[in-house]
Amino acid sequence: METVRGIIDAIKPQRTVFALEMMPWVFPDSADTYLELIKAIDRKGFGVHFDPVNIISSPRAYYRTGDLIRDFFSKLGPHIRNCHAKDILLRGNLTVHLDEVIPGQGVLDYRAFLTELHKLHPDTPLMIEHLRTNEEYQQAADYIRGVAAELRIPL
């Protein structure tokens, strides 16, 4: 926390925020722990980067992605400054094995994700990541745009 405070205090961001990306193996690992971190850091220049796939680390979370997303936005919406877009798929390997996949090829509830994201500032970035080819990025973008169109959400 001291390091984050030090960075924010030194930079004194005016039009941006410093945010930590959630990862499955380190804190913050949930909406509640991210909220605790925001309170502990106690700086206006600290915000939230939301990557829902990075906090899906159990079958319980995997089968309830819509609930996880809605809970995260309800608790942290005003602090969210950008999001990552990808998808997740549970494989039949032992032990629990979760893979990142192209949006639309997994179980992430993009209807919930885009609905909640649409409630934020219209310039909140949604960035597709970790794909291998331009074609995969195009496929991902087409899927996300298709879901948004079904929901009548402009992108």
Where are these regions (language model features)?
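Active-site acidic/histidine proton-transfer and metal-coordination neighborhood
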Residues: M1-F50
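Hydrophobic faces of well-ordered beta-strands that scaffold small-molecule active sites
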Residues: F18-L20, F46-F50, R81-H84, T124-E129
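Gly/Pro-rich active-site loop or hairpin
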Residues: A31, N54-D123, R132
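N-terminal pre-domain/capping segments
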Residues: R5, R43-H49, D67, T115, ...
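Distinct, well-ordered alpha-helical segments
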Residues: V26-F46, P59-F73, Y137-R145
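A structural alpha-helix within SAM-dependent methyltransferase catalytic domains
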Residues: M1, R5-K12, L35-K39, F73, ...
